[in-house]
C-alpha cells in the first residue's frame, strides 16, 4: 500500500546518504591529492635564486634558508595541504623547466610562455612584469634603437622567457645566455657585455648596486608569472589554481609581496 509520508521523506533520506558518502570519500580524495601533489610526503617547491628577490625570484638568507614571494606562497600551500614544505633551489627558471621531467619538484611559480606550456601545466597568473635592458657603466646606448646595433653584446639568463623575448626583439645585437644572475652582473660591471635583459624591477635593483649603469625606459616584452605543476597532474593543478585564486583575493599574495620588499608593487594579473 502506498505510504505518502514515506515518499515525502525520500529527499531527506537521499541527502543523508549523499552526506555520508561525502564523508566517506573526502579522506580518500584528500589522500589521492596528496599522492599526486606531494608524493614524497612533502610539498617540493621549485624556486630560482638571485641576489634581489621579487615576485618570481627568491633569495638565500644568511641563516641558509630562503626568502621570497614563491617561498611564502609555497609555505602556505603546504600548510593548506597538510604536509611539510621543502624548497628545491635552481639558478634560473630554465633549470626549473628542465627538471620537470626528472620529478624533483611538485609545484613552482615561474614565468610562462608557449614553449613552457607544452612542458607543464599552468594555473592563474599572479604577476605581469615589464622586460627591458640595463646598459653597462659609461654606455652611449640610450634607447632600443641605439642598443640594436651590430657588435652590441646583450646577456640574458639562459633558456628563459626573457631571453627568448630578447632574441625575437633584437635584430642586430647578439643575445647570449648565461646560467646565473651573478655571472651576468659581473660581466656588466667589468664591461664585457653591453646590456642585460631582465624584468624592470630586477634591473632597477641591480642599477643601485652597480654605479653608472642605466635601465632603459622602453619595454620590449611583458612577462607573466603563474603557478605551475608537472603535466598530467589534474588534481594538483586544480588545487594549485584554487589556492592561487584565493591567495589573490584574500590578501595572502599581498602579504607575501609586502613581506618581501614589494609594498609599492601592485598586483598585476592581466597584460595590457
Regions found by a protein language model. Name each.
Residues 75, 79, 84-148, 214:
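Acidic, polar ligand-binding/catalytic clefts
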Amino acid at each position: 500500500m502506498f505510504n505518502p509520508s514515506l515518499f515525502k521523506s525520500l529527499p531527506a533520506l537521499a541527502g543523508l546518504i549523499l552526506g555520508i558518502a561525502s564523508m566517506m570519500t573526502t579522506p580518500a580524495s584528500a589522500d589521492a591529492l596528496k599522492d599526486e601533489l606531494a608524493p614524497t610526503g612533502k610539498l617540493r617547491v621549485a624556486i630560482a635564486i638571485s641576489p634581489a628577490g621579487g615576485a618570481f625570484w627568491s633569495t638565500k638568507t644568511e641563516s641558509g634558508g630562503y626568502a621570497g614571494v614563491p617561498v611564502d606562497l609555497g609555505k602556505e600551500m603546504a600548510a593548506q595541504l597538510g604536509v611539510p614544505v621543502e624548497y628545491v633551489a635552481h639558478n634560473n627558471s630554465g633549470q626549473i623547466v628542465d627538471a620537470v621531467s626528472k620529478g624533483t619538484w611538485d609545484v613552482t611559480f615561474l614565468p610562462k610562455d608557449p614553449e613552457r606550456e607544452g612542458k607543464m601545466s599552468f594555473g592563474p597568473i599572479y604577476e605581469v612584469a615589464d622586460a627591458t635592458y640595463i646598459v653597462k657603466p659609461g654606455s652611449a646606448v640610450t634607447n632600443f634603437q641605439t642598443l640594436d646595433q651590430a657588435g652590441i653584446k646583450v646577456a640574458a639568463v639562459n633558456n628563459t622567457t626573457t631571453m627568448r623575448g630578447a632574441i625575437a626583439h633584437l635584430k642586430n645585437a647578439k643575445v647570449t645566455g648565461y646560467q646565473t644572475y651573478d655571472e651576468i652582473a659581473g660581466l656588466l660591471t667589468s664591461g664585457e657585455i653591453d646590456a642585460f635583459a631582465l624584468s624592470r624591477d630586477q634591473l632597477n635593483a641591480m642599477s643601485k648596486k652597480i654605479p653608472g649603469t642605466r635601465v632603459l625606459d622602453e619595454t620590449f616584452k611583458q612577462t607573466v608569472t603563474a603557478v605551475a605543476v608537472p603535466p598530467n597532474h589534474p588534481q594538483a593543478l586544480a588545487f594549485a589554481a584554487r589556492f592561487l585564486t584565493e591567495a589573490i583575493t584574500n590578501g595572502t599574495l599581498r602579504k607575501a609581496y609586502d613581506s618581501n620588499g614589494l609594498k609599492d608593487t601592485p598586483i598585476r594579473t592581466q597584460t595590457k
